[in-house]
């Protein structure tokens, strides 16, 4: 008798096939994402998946460029940074802090931490926005204070001995020179950018932009700005402008959309160009340089960005399948003890041999606290006695007037911040620079005059704070000079 064939549910088969596709889409959307096999092994807490997940969490929590020195840290250092970053963000599971940092175990716990980050915010979209290729001329406009910089903080260096004042003055002069250099380079860049936008007006197929960006203008340079490509004989100056021979093969026009399409066709089929143009593109020819190598690299980068965007869209479509699978992963974990809810989420490890030193530090801190309290009481009593003796003198009136003005300024600044926070959302993030003659602006557009006016007001506030701090420094220097009778203080000339 033949074996009875088992009936297969098509819906169950589709659900089983959707899970690998969802995990593969998530892997492609993350920076240096591991293979889907790593996720499967992490579900069963296999140790070979631990190092890849530590590195993935480090890339997600510290979005650094690939060439950065911090991106090639040791696995132990990356694990410590991941632990501190998750602790600062409020990760609730205590088991992560107890994992070894050598990558020997804990892949399932790392998978849970990654899913916690995915549930808190759009991580793939954030990674895609940080690594996107800007084709337009952009400027970052941000009127909010940066609370923290991405990545671990820079190490703080202390001077080993006394520092010469002349060395400090030399450093200040060097810093001032570099600052002026930066400002002049920014002004020159803005002038060149304005010329490019003015000269390429009307060349863009998108009527809302009307002009080309620097990247697009680089693709359409004039013959005088062409590259020098060494051929078999003498060097020849090739025209990198739009080749006229492409008009018979490709779509006509100088718009960037047709230009990108035609450029891709040229990269794929160099035979469309005449001999002078096709020789540098022939990989088997005598030319050592490729004319369109920057173009080809840019197109490949855009292709990779499009692939990541498609992966993010595929991940969003199959996200529910992944979360159902994560429910099964969470079900295989041992439940945490109830007493851990009242404990802090992160407990630093303290060696046993340092217990005596820690007690000594505690006693020293308590003694220092008592001294500070006594000094504060003495200073408060002296201030009250001084205020009671000169309550109606001119010095007291001037001090009271200065204090009132300072308090009014601080209150005015706080009130402006409060009104600004309660009003419409402030501009944040990169904005594309567009030159418009008609002056029309959309709802989400930001005028340059508004940004300049805001920056000037912020500059005035910062200058006022700088003058106040400089006055405090002069008073402190005068006090130090008065304490040393043999010291001659020659202030620098006014700038």
Curated annotation (Swiss-Prot):
Q: Which InterPro entries match?
A: TEDC1 (IPR043535), TEDC1_dom (IPR027996)
**Annotated region described as Disordered, given as residue ranges:** 417-440
Q: Which Pfam families match?
A: TEDC1 (PF14970)
A Gene Ontology BP annotation from the UniProt entry: positive regulation of smoothened signaling pathway
Q: Which residues form a coiled coil?
A: 355-387, 452-480
Q: Which UniProt keywords apply?
A: Cell projection, Coiled coil, Cytoplasm, Cytoskeleton
Keyword Cytoplasm part of the UniProt annotation: yes
Localisation per UniProt entry: Cell projection, Cilium; Cytoplasm, Cytoskeleton, Microtubule organizing center, Centrosome, Centriole
The answer to keyword Coiled coil applying to this record is yes
Q: Could you name the Gene Ontology cellular component terms for this entry?
A: centriole; cilium; cytoplasm
| Impact when changing residue 269 to R | Found in patients with primary microcephaly; uncertain significance
Functional description taken from the UniProt entry: Acts as a positive regulator of ciliary hedgehog signaling. Required for centriole stability. May play a role in counteracting perturbation of actin filaments, such as after treatment with the actin depolymerizing microbial metabolite Chivosazole F.
This protein's assembly is summarised as:
Interacts with TEDC2. Found in a complex with TEDC1, TEDC2, TUBE1 and TUBD1.
| Name assigned to this protein | Tubulin epsilon and delta complex protein 1
Which organism is this entry from? Homo sapiens
């Amino acid at each position: 008798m033949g074996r009875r064939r088992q009936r297969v549910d098509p819906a169950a088969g589709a659900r089983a096939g959707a899970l690998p596709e969802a995990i593969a889409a998530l892997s492609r959307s993350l920076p240096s994402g591991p293979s889907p096999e790593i996720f499967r092994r992490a579900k069963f807490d296999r140790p070979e998946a631990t190092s890849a997940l530590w590195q993935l969490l480090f890339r997600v929590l510290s979005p650094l460029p690939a060439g950065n020195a911090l991106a090639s840290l040791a696995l132990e250092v990356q694990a410590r940074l991941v632990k501190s970053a998750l602790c600062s963000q409020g990760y609730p599971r205590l088991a992560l802090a107890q994992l070894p940092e050598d990558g020997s175990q804990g892949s399932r716990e790392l998978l849970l931490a990654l899913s916690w980050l995915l549930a808190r915010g759009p991580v793939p979209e954030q990674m895609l926005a940080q690594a996107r290729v800007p084709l337009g001329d952009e400027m970052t406009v941000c009127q909010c204070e940066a609370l923290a910089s991405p990545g671990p903080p820079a190490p703080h260096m202390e001077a080993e001995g006394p520092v010469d004042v002349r060395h400090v003055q030399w450093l200040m002069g060097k810093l001032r020179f570099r600052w002026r250099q930066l400002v002049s380079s920014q002004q020159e860049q803005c002038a060149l950018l304005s010329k490019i936008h003015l000269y390429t007006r009307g060349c863009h197929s998108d009527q809302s932009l009307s002009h080309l960006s620097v990247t697009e203008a680089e693709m359409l340079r004039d013959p005088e700005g062409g590259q020098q490509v060494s051929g078999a004989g003498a060097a020849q100056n090739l025209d990198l402008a739009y080749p006229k021979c492409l008009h018979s093969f490709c779509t006509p026009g100088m718009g960037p959309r047709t230009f990108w399409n035609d450029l891709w066709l040229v990269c794929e089929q160099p035979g469309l160009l005449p001999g002078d143009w096709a020789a540098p593109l022939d990989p088997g020819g005598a030319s050592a340089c490729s004319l369109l190598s920057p173009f080809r690299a840019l197109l490949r980068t855009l292709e990779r960005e499009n692939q990541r965007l498609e992966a993010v869209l595929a991940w969003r479509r199959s996200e529910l399948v992944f979360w159902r699978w994560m429910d099964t992963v969470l079900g295989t974990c041992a439940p945490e003890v109830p007493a851990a809810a009242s404990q802090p989420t992160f407990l630093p490890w303290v060696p046993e041999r340092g217990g005596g030193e820690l007690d000594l530090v505690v006693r020293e801190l308590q003694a220092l606290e008592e001294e500070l309290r006594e000094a504060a009481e003495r200073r408060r009593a002296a201030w009250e006695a001084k205020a009671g003796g000169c309550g109606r003198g001119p010095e007291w009136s001037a001090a009271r007037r200065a204090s009132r003005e300072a308090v009014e300024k601080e209150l005015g600044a706080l009130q402006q911040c409060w009104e600004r926070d309660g009003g419409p959302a402030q501009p944040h993030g990169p904005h594309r620079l567009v030159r418009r003659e008609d002056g029309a602006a959309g709802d989400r557009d930001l005028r340059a005059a508004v940004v300049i006016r805001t920056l000037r007001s912020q500059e005035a506030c910062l200058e006022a704070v700088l003058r106040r701090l400089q006055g405090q420094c002069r008073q402190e220097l005068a006090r130090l000079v008065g304490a040393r009778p043999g010291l001659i203080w020659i202030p620098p000339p006014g700038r």
